From Swiss-Prot:
1-deoxy-D-xylulose 5-phosphate binds at G157, A184, G185, N206, T207. GO terms for molecular function: thiazole synthase activity. GO terms for biological process: thiamine diphosphate biosynthetic process. Its EC number is 2.8.1.10. Homotetramer. Forms heterodimers with either ThiH or ThiS. It is an enzyme of class 2 (transferase). The keyword Transferase applies. It holds the Pfam family ThiG. The lineage of its organism: Bacteria, Pseudomonadati, Pseudomonadota, Gammaproteobacteria, Legionellales. It is found in: Cytoplasm. This is Thiazole synthase.
Length: 262
């Protein structure tokens, strides 16, 4: 179990709800993933599934904690207004804060992000800021009152994995008491393992599951990957060596010669 913003959870995998082929695929993937937290955008237009249920009706059946986001916002004012609407609509003070500054790589706008985070925290929100792995930006967000950081592994939807493991490892070292969750860029289960082996608290992903050939099966794979990576970190991985080291100790006399000499 671990604590995320006051909620006791067993799964360290957070999953998005966009881009699935159908509501049925989304529901099955979320079920298979074992996640207890799903992200949703209030700017999403509701759509009917194969069985005629709306997106919102389908979400209610999942019995997960909701993490609304401010996707599509370009400045602090828009993000703050969206967060207030989300709090009213979903009855939660959680908000995944996204303020995008570039259309090419969907990189966060750092100045507006910090501004929005500070105001929202003052208004009683638990802010989950989507940010880059920049150490100074993350420090400013912590100074603003953020108890959670969600740095990217790579640009949203790129599937490139961890493009700067050193920067992420540095964040873990510098912020030992901050909840760190990788958000964006994860493309395959091995990336999730790598994240958790660095000591991160969780992984948030969407596209890697939603656009897989078999979303439900991929969700299962990510479920096990996150568990494996976390257990590897807790178990204490051996250090790398520059030279070989035999796993079986050698002695001068083979054991069968020793037996014959008895």
């Amino acid at each position: 179990m671990w604590n995320l913003a006051g909620k006791e959870l067993s799964s360290r995998l957070l999953l998005g709800t966009a881009c699935y082929p159908s509501l049925e695929h989304m529901q099955q993937a979320i079920h298979n993933s074992g996640t207890e937290v799903i992200t949703i955008s209030i700017k999403r237009q509701t759509s009917a599934g194969l069985d005629g249920e709306s997106f919102w009706q389908a979400v209610k059946k999942l019995d997960c904690h909701l993490l609304p986001n401010t996707a599509g916002c370009r400045n602090a004012e828009a993000a703050i207004n969206t967060a207030e609407i989300a709090r009213e609509l979903f009855n939660t003070h959680w908000i995944k804060l996204e303020v995008i500054g570039d259309d090419y790589n969907l990189q966060p706008e750092p100045f507006e992000l910090i501004k929005a985070a500070r105001i929202l925290i003052d208004r009683g929100f638990e802010v989950f800021p989507y940010c880059t792995d920049d150490l100074v930006l993350c420090q400013k967000l912590v100074d603003a009152g953020c108890k959670i950081l969600m740095p990217w592994g790579a640009p949203i939807g790129s599937g490139k994995g961890l493009i700067n493991p050193y920067a992420l490892e540095t964040l873990r070292y510098r912020f030992p008491d901050i909840t760190l969750i990788i958000d964006a860029g994860i493309g395959k289960p091995s990336h999730a393992v790598q994240v958790m082996e660095l000591g991160f608290d969780g992984v948030l992903l969407n596209t890697a599951v939603a656009l897989a050939n078999h979303p439900a099966l991929m969700a299962t794979a990510f479920r096990h990957a996150v568990i494996a990576g976390h257990q590897a970190f807790i178990g204490g991985m051996m250090s790398e060596r520059n030279v070989a080291h035999p796993s079986t100790p050698l002695i001068d006399t083979p054991f069968w010669h020793q037996v014959n000499n008895l």
